């Protein structure tokens, strides 16, 4: 596993309701076979923590040593079955997801076919993809970044909430500028917040957003707060989406049976393709659409595209739109083509990503506590 890091210029000042984003951290899984063919995966959990990832990669590498790299589902069951006592829904699943993606990329490169063919072939000719950033507390930066996304071909943009009492003016500014041109997703980012808002805060925000045109409201509560999700649906007709930090179909089961989400979001670089398909199939049975969560590098982006093209109930996939140079080094073709909010099937072998070991020197990782989740409880939102 290689950890890459890029420090954002201070002028960007990326922040949201639960913390600040000072760095782009990319934990890359590189899987190599006996013939020196390689595949790439990514581990979303590695953005937040370093040491456990290293140990878990070593653990699963020993477990899979001398295994046939083409037996991908068997490898998943072997990893999960051997770790179930301590890894039912934890960080280990996230490491498994990164390995799973790397195995598919490796097989695609060896067979000289795109990953979507290994996943059963396309269900649709194109997939909607949205630009995901909006980590701003002022309309000027928000609108400039959204315009950057629009000029590339995006027609849906996601913004993060910083202050629930101030976000409506930003939403209003966006809708005025991009009316009939680009739609907006609002992410409350409470799913993994250290100090989440009171239930009333999220309900009041949803009521205010009713007057604005948005695609969906994402994670207005901590992911385990099923009652909050039930309550908010009594007060709003907005589409409510979640819960990206849940890694398995088994964990999503209660959310579907309790009907607390309108749109399911699983993280592609946590669940991987094997478990991601189970989540989508379960959602399909419950007539629920899926919006793939992909808050990572080009590896996660391409994984979301390949997967989304092959699954009937995937409505969106996500493109992490923070401004950094790492993606240019990982995209095989430097960028993906986006037109009128959609992207089509990639013309590539594997995922369409590449890796040079020298990237570790170009983007060196510095071990430290990540600031993406702040634990300060000095200002708890009550209304």
Residue positions per predicted region:
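Extended hydrophobic packing segments that form well-structured cores
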Residues: 351-383
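Structured beta-strand/loop patches that form or line metal/cofactor-binding pockets in enzymes
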Residues: 1-40, 44-45, 322-329, 379-383
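Metal-dependent enolase-superfamily TIM-barrel catalytic cores that perform enediolate-based chemistry
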Residues: 120, 125-236
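Conserved, mostly hydrophobic/aromatic
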Residues: 29, 36, 99, 112, ...
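Shared catalytic-loop signature of beta/alpha-barrel
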Residues: 213, 224-241, 246-342, 346-350
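Metal- or metallocofactor-binding catalytic centers and their adjacent structured scaffolds
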Residues: 32-110, 382-383
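A cross-domain feature marking catalytic cores of carbohydrate-active enzymes
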Residues: 43, 131-134, 159-161, 186-190, ...
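N-terminal amphipathic alpha-helix/helix-capping segment at the start of soluble metabolic enzymes
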Residues: 1, 83, 109, 113-125, ...
């Amino acid at each position: 596993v290689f950890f890459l890091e890029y420090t954002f210029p201070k002028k960007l000042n990326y922040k949201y309701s639960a913390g600040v984003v000072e760095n782009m951290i990319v934990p890359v899984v590189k899987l190599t076979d006996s013939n020196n063919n390689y595949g790439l995966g990514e581990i979303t959990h590695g953005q937040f923590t370093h040491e456990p990832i290293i140990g878990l990669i070593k653990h699963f590498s020993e477990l899979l040593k001398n295994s046939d790299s083409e037996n991908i589902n068997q490898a998943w069951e072997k990893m999960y079955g051997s770790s179930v006592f301590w890894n039912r829904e934890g960080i280990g699943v996230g490491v498994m997801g990164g390995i799973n993606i790397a195995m598919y990329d490796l097989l695609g490169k060896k067979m000289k076919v795109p990953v979507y063919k290994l996943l059963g072939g396309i269900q649709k000719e194109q997939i909607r993809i949205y630009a995901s950033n909006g980590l701003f507390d002022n309309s000027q930066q928000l609108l400039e970044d959204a315009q950057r996304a629009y000029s590339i071909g995006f027609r849906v943009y996601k913004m993060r909430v910083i202050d629930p009492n101030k976000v409506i003016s930003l939403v209003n500014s966006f809708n005025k500028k991009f009316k009939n041109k680009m739609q907006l997703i609002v992410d409350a980012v409470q799913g993994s917040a250290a100090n989440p808002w009171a239930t009333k805060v999220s309900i009041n925000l949803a009521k205010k957003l009713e007057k604005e045109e948005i695609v969906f409201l994402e994670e207005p509560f901590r992911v385990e707060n099923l009652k909050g999700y039930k309550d908010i649906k009594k007060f709003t007709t907005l589409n409510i989406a979640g819960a990206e930090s849940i890694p398995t179909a088994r964990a999503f089961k209660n959310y579907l049976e309790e009907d607390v989400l309108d749109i399911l979001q699983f993280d592609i670089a946590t669940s991987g393709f094997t478990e991601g398909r189970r989540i989508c199939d379960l959602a399909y049975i419950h007539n629920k659409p899926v919006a793939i969560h992909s808050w990572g590098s080009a590896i996660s982006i391409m994984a979301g595209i390949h997967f989304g093209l092959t699954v009937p109930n995937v409505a969106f996939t996500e493109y992490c739109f923070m401004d950094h140079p790492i993606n240019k080094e990982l995209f095989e073709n430097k960028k993906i083509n986006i037109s009128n909010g959609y992207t089509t099937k990639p013309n590539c072998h594997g995922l369409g990503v590449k890796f040079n070991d020298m990237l570790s020197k170009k983007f060196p990782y510095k071990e430290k506590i990540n600031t993406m989740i702040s634990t300060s409880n000095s200002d708890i939102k009550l209304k």
